[in-house]
Amino acid sequence: GFGATVTTLTLVSIKDRGASALLTTDDVSYLGVALDDFDGGLVGLEDLLVFQAYDVDAVINKAAHGDGVTVPAKLDWSTFTSTGLDISAAQGLLNTTSLGNLTASVDVAIDGGVALNVLSGVLVAKGDFTIALGQVKSALLPSGALQDADAMTLTLTNVGVFVGVGGSLNANGTPTDYSNDTVENGTLGFGATVTTLTLVSIKDRG
């Protein structure tokens, strides 16, 4: 399993009933989720894999149409305004993680750190990561500037890696704080550091 602590978890859900309150097929549902300061680890597989995530922020932005076919636009939670039930505090929390505003172009975004040790030192790694999934538009893509294309970005920073025999994670005197862990090379293998690794992938739907 997975044991974790979360400083703040925020969820905002809105259902637009459409033109007819009696029909569900014209309803549109909107969901915004923000996870602020998540720390957790894998439990039960310590002999095979030690996996600890720390200082993780995550956001999710989704929209669904009641007919199950139409793909509605997601909300920009940073500019959305409403009256009635006061959702301003919760809405504000959707936009105050380290990932910035939760806009309509974001599906999922995650930022944080991870420390892992596979098979007692065969693969040891520690570093920070940012992942974002969403949409972009560009006149330079075959589908043109009016069509969404799926995009993913992955950035790894300050990564230390060892692959071989006898690697380990040095807790540096703070066994419950993984943010200051360092990778210790083993007796035989390959050790490396990466300041920044960036990957951008775009899929044009045609």
Regions found by a protein language model. Give the residues of each.
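N-terminal low-complexity, acidic/Ser/Thr/Gly/Pro-rich segments
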Residues: 1-206
